[in-house]
Amino acid sequence: MSGQPKRLMVMAGGTGGHVFPGLAVAHHLMAQGWQVRWLGTADRMEADLVPKHGINIEFIRISGLRGKGVKALLAAPLRIFNAWRQARAIMKRFKPDVVLGMGGYVSGPGGLAAWSLGIPVVLHEQNGIAGLTNKWLAKIATTVMQAFPGAFPNAEVVGNPVRTDVLALPLPQTRLVSRDGPIRVLVVGGSQGARVLNQTLPQVAARLGDAVTIWHQSGKGAQHTVEQAYAEAGQPQHKVTEFIDDMAAAYAWADVVVCRSGALTVSEIAAAGLPAIFVPFQHKDRQQYWNALPLENAGAAKILEQPQFTAEAVADTLAGWSRDTLLTMAERARAVSILDATERVASEVIRVART
């Protein structure tokens, strides 16, 4: 086996926050000659996205258990067992030297299958609070890493793997020091948008007038409604798009970002070196709050939880930040970011792989 390329199976799915960091590590190792195969589910985003990146994907049938009712919970052991058997059969065929769990429902049965076959299991937790699947898998994993401190008490903090075009952006001092004119506000709600952002930011624009210029990513199907809201607020000049294909270019344009605080978003904003107003998605474990807290503690961001996220609060916050303040915050964001997360995760995969 010594002359043959090493084999990695990445287990990740469901959301971009799981899939994109996995892709970053996969590409890094493929450039070193590794063979990579992906384990996912056929009805989530990875089914289309991963093959576009030149990686073969295998599917198992598994879904989440939250909010499914008593019947689904009673059936869960059988479903998990079947998914475990499917994952085990796939791994017997591919024979990975190591598996990398990046989150999503697929990681549970996939990690158990690898463990049962004696394959090393590397886990990476993207969020500030560990998900249920990773909490279980951490007990059997060879190595556990985390993006933010606090998800696991003794795991190494390695950051989140971030896209190379974001890492390649000029430093905040280079981008921002000579800017003048209206503050450039980038509003990002994710691919599905965020209703609270779509409803609130047109009112913020009305309060701030010519002091800001806004680029607002509304999410699928919301562009016309949000454009109309800006027009009705007397602020039709602001740019609204459903999606932003080139996030690095958007970050380069912005002076400040207003957004949810998903793990990958927070990590990208820190790596780009941008101040932010975060409005965490309201979830019972406050996962997005804990993702954003390190940047707020560093003086690089402000968290406004959804009940406090009013047009008045956002407008007052933006109006209170001078260009010098924004530059200082941007430099603090960049200073706390972990820029070599991809290399750190990949190095651990290499270290624990079967010889």
Curated annotation (Swiss-Prot):
The keyword Transmembrane does not apply. Keywords: Cell cycle, Cell division, Cell inner membrane, Cell membrane, Cell shape, Cell wall biogenesis/degradation, Glycosyltransferase, Membrane, Peptidoglycan synthesis, Transferase. The keyword Transmembrane helix does not apply. CDD domains: GT28_MurG. GO terms for cellular component: plasma membrane. Its EC number is 2.4.1.227. UDP-N-acetyl-alpha-D-glucosamine binds at residues 15-17, 127, 163, 191, 244, 263-268, 288. Its main location: membrane. GO terms for biological process: carbohydrate metabolic process; cell division; cell wall organization; lipid glycosylation; peptidoglycan biosynthetic process; regulation of cell shape. It is found in: Cell inner membrane. Pathway: Cell wall biogenesis; peptidoglycan biosynthesis. One of its GO terms (molecular function) is UDP-N-acetyl-D-glucosamine:N-acetylmuramoyl-L-alanyl-D-glutamyl-meso-2,6-diaminopimelyl-D-alanyl-D-alanine-diphosphoundecaprenol 4-beta-N-acetylglucosaminlytransferase activity. Cell wall formation. Catalyzes the transfer of a GlcNAc subunit on undecaprenyl-pyrophosphoryl-MurNAc-pentapeptide (lipid intermediate I) to form undecaprenyl-pyrophosphoryl-MurNAc-(pentapeptide)GlcNAc (lipid intermediate II). Belongs to the glycosyltransferase 28 family. MurG subfamily. This is UDP-N-acetylglucosamine--N-acetylmuramyl-(pentapeptide) pyrophosphoryl-undecaprenol N-acetylglucosamine transferase.
